[in-house]
């Protein structure tokens, strides 16, 4: 099986339930066609670099998965049919170096997700304003 990364952008107008349904749909297409999902990352809603289908923002997701090469055509077909996905990109990791990077990415993402949230810090005391230095100017008589 080959190693892949799928980045896709959903419309910003979708509700949380609709977003979850679309992500589950993509995951289902991958698993039904013989793929194994390593990890799913929600990158959040971000401003797009340029307007896509009249949207200036989008909700980003990245899915790292292993799958047979035949899955890519079926996945692409299903994503193109879905109107709520405004853009997608599939990346294939081929050589040993790229596969090792893929595994490090998946492992690193899983570790950051498992970390417990830190306790909030105590608020700091407000800083005193710095006094501006006023330099004396000397004028020479000419």
Swiss-Prot record:
Pfam families: Ribosomal_S6 (PF01250). Belongs to the bacterial ribosomal protein bS6 family. One of its GO terms (molecular function) is structural constituent of ribosome. Residues 113-142 are annotated as: Disordered. Disulfide bonds: none annotated. Residues 113-136 have a biased composition (Basic and acidic residues). NCBIfam families: S6. One of its GO terms (cellular component) is cytosolic small ribosomal subunit. This is Small ribosomal subunit protein bS6.
């Amino acid at each position: 099986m080959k190693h892949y990364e799928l980045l896709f952008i959903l419309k910003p107008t979708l509700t949380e339930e609709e977003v979850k349904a679309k992500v589950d749909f993509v995951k289902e297409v991958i698993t039904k066609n013989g793929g194994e999902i390593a990890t799913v990352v929600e990158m959040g809603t971000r401003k797009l670099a340029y307007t896509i289908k009249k949207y200036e923002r989008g909700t980003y997701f990245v899915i790292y998965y292993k799958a047979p090469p035949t899955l890519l055509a079926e996945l692409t077909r299903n994503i193109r049919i879905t109107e709520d996905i405004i853009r997608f990109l599939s990346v294939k990791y081929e050589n040993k170096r790229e596969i090792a990077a893929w595994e490090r990415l998946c492992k690193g993402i899983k570790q950051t997700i498992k970390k417990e949230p830190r306790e909030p810090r105590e608020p700091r005391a407000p800083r005193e304003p710095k006094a501006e230095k006023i330099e004396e100017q000397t004028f020479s008589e000419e």
